[in-house]
Amino acid sequence: MRLALVAVGRLKRGPERDLAEGYRARADALARGLGLSAVQLTELPESRARRAPDRCAEEGAAILACLPAGSAVIVMDEGGRAVTSAGLAEQVAAWRDGGRPGLTIVIGGADGLCESVRHRADLVFAFGAATLPHGLVRVLVLEQLYRVMTILAGHPYHRGAP
């Protein structure tokens, strides 16, 4: 199953980028043995439209154009539902074992996501109700992908609840 992360905006050099690249490298090292690909990162430019609804629509169209047919889609949104790491691992395994060709995780722009992107999602996911900086969300998404892989591989990184 192909793994992809689509994010609006670029991560500048700094600690968030270093952490994101570190977790991505760790995930990539485990992926093949689990029937998964390395994580493909697509950074989309932020819209320069003047009005927020226009920016959301423009960025949404660019996001939708990046979603492969048949791919499972997780959209990061503060209004989404919280899922445990073990629950996320179960869902990823179910998509993989069910023959889904890919999994794409989407991080929208500063103005959020348009409804058409949310509608395309198989899972609207949140790390909580708080609004988080996009760079930090990217780090957390890649850490969770790595954690999912360690759970699927039986690696001791994820200790979970006793």
UniProtKB/Swiss-Prot annotation:
Pfam families: SPOUT_MTase. CDD domains: RlmH-like. It is an enzyme of class 2 (transferase). One of its GO terms (molecular function) is rRNA (pseudouridine-N3-)-methyltransferase activity. Its EC number is 2.1.1.177. Belongs to the RNA methyltransferase RlmH family. Specifically methylates the pseudouridine at position 1915 (m3Psi1915) in 23S rRNA. Homodimer. This is Ribosomal RNA large subunit methyltransferase H. The gene is rlmH.
